[in-house]
Curated annotation (Swiss-Prot):
Zn(2+) binds at residues 16, 18, 36, 39. Part of the 50S ribosomal subunit. Gene3D superfamilies: Ribosomal protein L31 (4.10.830.30). Its cofactor is Zn(2+). Signal peptide: none annotated. Binds 1 zinc ion per subunit. The keyword Zinc applies. One of its GO terms (cellular component) is ribonucleoprotein complex. Belongs to the bacterial ribosomal protein bL31 family. Type A subfamily. One of its GO terms (biological process) is translation. Keywords: Metal-binding, Ribonucleoprotein, Ribosomal protein, RNA-binding, rRNA-binding, Zinc. This is Large ribosomal subunit protein bL31.
Length: 66
């Protein structure tokens, strides 16, 4: 393998929309996810929706639509 061509692999914080944070390894600085094992219905056994608020939601909010 060539030296100096691979990205740096480091420990980063993974942040969920429910507020849960945990460490993982990645080449990115920060990772954001919509669901994790703390809020996913399969693991919790109950129904819960986390609102991520995407581009369409921001547009509608900005221009007072819906």
């Amino acid at each position: 393998m060539k030296t100096g061509i691979h990205p740096n692999y480091k420990t980063v914080m993974v942040k969920c929309t429910c507020g849960n944070e945990f460490e993982s390894g990645s080449v990115k600085e920060e990772i954001r996810v919509e669901t994790c094992s703390e809020c996913h219905p399969f693991y919790t056994g109950r129904q819960k929706f986390a609102e991520a608020g995407g581009r369409v939601d921001r547009f509608n909010k900005k221009y007072g639509l819906k």
